[in-house]
């Protein structure tokens, strides 16, 4: 939202502060066409029980999620399956691998930090 706020307030855009952000002002002005290509997501953290580090790419109707810990991927057609119940990674392998490659290239291009194993970690039982 940062580029949108900057544009609405007349402030100078600062791309070095919002590398992959874009202004939504054209949408607010009624322009229904908004093609931003792919949207990328990288979250290399453990947050709560059951959560694991992952990255994702949303391109067109498809969303691919790559779980770093066990290296598995999930692919969803969000137009047909908004609740992400039918994993298409096995039935659309070529699309899944292509999106995973694109996500990997983006991660490399922005020097994304990946999770590393901490041998000193000790779980605390409450």
Q: What are the roles of these predicted feature ranges?
A:
Residues 78, 92-95:
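C-terminal structured subdomain/cap of oxidoreductase catalytic cores
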Residues 81:
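Intrinsically disordered, low-complexity polar regions and short flexible loop motifs
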């Amino acid at each position: 939202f940062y580029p949108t706020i900057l544009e609405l307030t007349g402030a100078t855009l600062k791309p070095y502060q919002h590398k992959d952000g874009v202004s939504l002002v054209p949408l607010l002005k009624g322009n229904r066409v908004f093609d931003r290509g792919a949207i990328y997501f990288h979250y290399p953290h453990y947050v709560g029980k059951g959560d694991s580090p992952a990255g994702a790419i949303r391109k067109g109707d498809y969303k691919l999620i790559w779980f770093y810990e066990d290296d598995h991927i999930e692919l969803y057609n969000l137009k047909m399956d908004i609740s992400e119940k039918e994993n298409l990674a096995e039935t659309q392998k070529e699309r899944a691998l292509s999106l995973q490659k694109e996500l990997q290239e983006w991660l490399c291009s922005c020097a994304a930090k990946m999770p590393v194993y901490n041998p000193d970690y000790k779980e605390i039982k409450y």
